[in-house]
Amino acid sequence: MNSDDNRIASEHTLQGQLKLYYDLELPAAKPAPLLIALHGYGANKRQMMREAKQMAPENFALLSLQGFHQHMKEPKEPGGQWRFGFGWLTNFHPEDSVKIHHQALLDLIGSLTADGTVDRGRIFLLGFSQSCALNYRFAFWQPELLRGVIGICGGIPGDWETSADYKPTQAGVFHLTGTRDEFYSPERVADYEERLRLRAQNVEFKSYDAAHEIVPAMREDVRSWLTKHAA
């Protein structure tokens, strides 16, 4: 008889602590408008902070939160040093990662507004690629919290039409896409503007001559959009 016939297998979970890392840059004048910038898959907080500094007006506080799923990346050159990258979720219990993402944003916003560093009425959330749909989940789950949300070369939640978690918001929405994006092609994102308008009245959708990347024209338009909506 196979000994496995007498065994009972089951899956369990346990609670653990997770340390999240972020970079913060503050202007002299406070309380300041805040841009929270989240990177895409395989990147890190330093890379996204560089992007945020090129997109945000000078009077903005900048926060770059790093994804909590770490992985190794091959060296840039043969024989070189192995690198690290970070992501936000996988298809293994993604709801757990969504909760971590959401709670991290709530904690960061709560801390920075409580001490007067950030203007509670001028908080903006930006995501590139993988973090884009996660940010939309947060923005429409907390419809009164943000002044605006920006998505670059990313998607919208898969349960956008069916979930009761998403509420209408007065926050501005700016979605930027690349006409040569190999992951989010023009065909794939063709109905995004219409779908986002299901729960947001102030939606701007714009395409650029770009692949899966942030190009100078995008940076300029994001800066202008932030200036307008933070006024």
Report residues per predicted region.
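Active-site signature of alpha/beta-hydrolase-fold catalytic machinery across serine-
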Residues: R50, R137-W141
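Alpha/beta-hydrolase fold nucleophile elbow
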Residues: T117-G127
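A conserved short beta-strand
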Residues: E144-I156
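C-terminal catalytic histidine-bearing segment of alpha/beta-hydrolase fold enzymes
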Residues: F174, E187-A231
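Conserved alpha/beta-hydrolase "nucleophile elbow" surrounding the catalytic nucleophile
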Residues: H39-Y41, L126-F128, G178
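Short beta-strand/loop motif that positions the catalytic acidic residue
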Residues: H175-T177, D181
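Serine-hydrolase catalytic machinery in alpha/beta-hydrolase-like enzymes
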Residues: H12-V118
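Gly/Ala-rich beta-loop-alpha elbow adjacent to hydrolase catalytic centers
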Residues: G127-S131, N135
